[in-house]
Amino acid sequence: MRYLLFVIFLFISCSPLKKYELTGKKWEDEIKKLEALDKKETYSDQAVLFIGSSSIRLWKSIEEDLDTYEPIKRGYGGAHYYDIIHFTNRLVSPHKVKAIAIFVANDITGKEKGINNQTVDQDLSPKEVLKLVKFVTKEIRKSHEKIPVFFIETTPTSKRWKVWDKISYANDLIENYTTKNKNLFYIKTRSFYIGSDGMPNDNLFVKDKLHLNRKGYKLWGKIIKENFDKNLSL
């Protein structure tokens, strides 16, 4: 019995929900707003649910860009995998949909802060990002056991170019994970947003060089739609 209790304690203490137990609280109001939309909006069971960060939330032309699909937007600005783990069930379980698409791009940003006169890196490691991706997947599978789940690659941007190597490695880890698991798919985008000079193409972004402009979204939609067409039977 003691051994069993120890195993249970060890499992709970190692859970991402415990490790990042404080990260979700600041987003509670945003999640409640999204839940309110679930009560007001109606969709068919052929819809595709999009969850993630501001690139989802700000995608005003999503219905036009994904014309043959029925998108549901449930993104909130600044989302990280370390906070979306707290809300995955609430964002996903109410929806009977054809597929789920995820774009979360804020766990590796290059931001630092000073603590006791020392500079501290606030980013997660690529391997930690992968752990959270796996956790999110398990949460989704509790209510949607076999549904296709698409992970959209984090886009290369000038704003975060200094940490692109880390972002790229995290992308590679997630892609490799999807290839080994049934009904998980990875949407590669990086090559479309890199210019001939090997740098991010700023013509596809707004002034902050982080978020997509209309042209960037149109391209994003084309890439995503092609992946849906390939992997989802209409």
Regions found by a protein language model. Give the residues of each.
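N-terminal secretory targeting modules
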Residues: 1-50, 64, 231-234
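Catalytic nucleophile-elbow at a beta strand-turn-alpha helix junction centered on a G-D-S/GDSL motif
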Residues: 46-61, 79
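Structural recognition of the beta-strand scaffold that forms the well-ordered cores
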Residues: 48-51, 72-75, 99-104, 148-153, ...
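Oxyanion-hole/transition-state-stabilizing segment in secreted/luminal serine hydrolases
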Residues: 56-65, 70, 83-130, 155-158
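Second-shell loop/turn segments in exported
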Residues: 73-77, 120-126, 159-164, 206-210
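Generic structural signal for well-ordered alpha-helices
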Residues: 88, 133-138, 171
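Active-site segments of SGNH/GDSL-like serine hydrolases
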Residues: 104-109, 138-169, 190-191
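Catalytic His-Asp segment of secreted/periplasmic serine-dependent ester chemistry enzymes
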Residues: 155-234
